[in-house]
Amino acid sequence: GAHVFLEKPIAESVEEAKEIVDLARKNNLKLVIGYILRVHPSWMKFIEVAQDLGKPLVMRMNLNQQSSGKNWETHKCLMNSMSPIVDCGVHYVDVMCQMTRSKPVRVSAIGARLSEELNEGMYNYGKLQVSFEDGAVGWYEAGWGPMMSEVAFFVKDVVGPKGCVSIAGMKDGEETDDVDAHSKAESIKLHHAELNDNGEFAKQDEIIDCADEPDHDGLCYREQEVFLNAITNDVDLSDHMDDAVNSLRIVLAADEAFKTGKTVDL
């Protein structure tokens, strides 16, 4: 057998995902899944700050991509097997699970087919809603194609009892289908909900600068460092593999919810 670095999602079904993880465990081999946001310093900080906002959390995220030419062709190829909320959603659902540290219990979804160039039954816009055991809720929206709007296409925002934190992402003029821009964080804004005796805000908003961050290739290099370290130092990847299965379970439940029009209990 061989140690494996596997791009996300880990499989096209939960059963296949479990089979892959069980195989890695049985043969004592390392399996790292390409959750690139887990090695992104700005996103790691975003998760850390969100965990200090109290419970429950409200998590609002999206990544819509207005694509054309080769990028639209790539999107159509990806949609031969899975919708945008499945392909991209695993990243952001994984982030939500890290923020809440709670068990997801319910998933619902809406979606729309906005192009006749897609296979029958496929849709290129979707939005999932997930509820957690601790009362946290989150939504993730993803749409691909030449028709997609670039208004409010990069929302990364978390609200808790103690305040809210958000990522200020792409600059004006950047293309939404630019892979380098998808994980970019220009800065993180932290707002405190605490009020003083006059009923006014007790603290000013904080801006955490994220300008000095790796590009997409740099993040891919970090992923390979994680993989190499796991092999050379025999790192236990149990949680990493279980998280990959769980995030896939949520987005596939969202896909089912859209197709059936019913909320799915996990």
Regions found by a protein language model. Give the residues of each.
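Short glycine/proline- and charge-enriched loop/turn segments
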Residues: 1-2, 72-80, 203-209
